[in-house]
Amino acid sequence: MSEEQHPDTGLRGMVVPVTPLQQNCSILWCTTTNKAAVIDPGGDLDNILGAVEQNGVELEKILVTHAHIDHAGGVAELAERLDLPIEGPHPEDQFWIDRIEESGSKYGINARAFEPNRWLDGHDTVTIGEQTLGVRHCPGHTPGHVIFHHAPSQLAAVGDV
């Protein structure tokens, strides 16, 4: 796990490698409120929750860049376990969400389909505590891939683009 602070921007972050593919799941939090979001919880939820606890932050939502198994395999379970809303990806990734259980079986990842509380589009914003991140729709890797950009820190959570 690695932690990064963006001075004077109100945002801190940590990367937690998850799944057999060692995908980078991110935890971002507002330093004013200690409210946090987990981005792309592909699996290994106990590791993710351990990092959340270690940093003394409170998860308020799940953000999803795209619905490939290594990025979204743990979304349904985490949302259910902690009663968290799911934001993202773009609706064009519905096909991948519908197939996530089948995809997971190929990698030994138990996954379930999920329904986002909020689909995201290219000009939306999301909040983490008092921090606002812009959303950009970046189709290519998947048709519904989105990225999250925090302008004050110049940090971008880009999934696989």
Model-predicted regions and their roles:
Residues L28, D40, H66, L78, ...:
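Divalent metal-coordination and catalytic microenvironments
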Residues E102-S103, E115, T125, Q131-V161:
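Metallo-beta-lactamase
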Residues G43-T127:
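Active-site HxH/HxHxD metal-binding segment of metal-dependent hydrolases
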Residues V16-V18, I109-N110, E115-N117, H137-P139:
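Short Gly/Pro-enriched turn/cap motifs at secondary-structure boundaries
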Residues K35-I39, K61-V64, V135-H137:
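Short catalytic-loop micro-motif centered on adjacent basic/acidic residues
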Residues G10, Q22, R112-F114, L120, ...:
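Residues that act as N-cap/strand-start positions at coil-to-secondary-structure junctions
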Residues E3-N55, I147-V161:
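Conserved beta-strand hairpin/beta-sheet module of binuclear metal-dependent hydrolase folds
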Residues P7-R12, G104-G108, G129-Q131:
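Short Pro/Gly-enriched beta-strand edge/turn motifs at strand-loop
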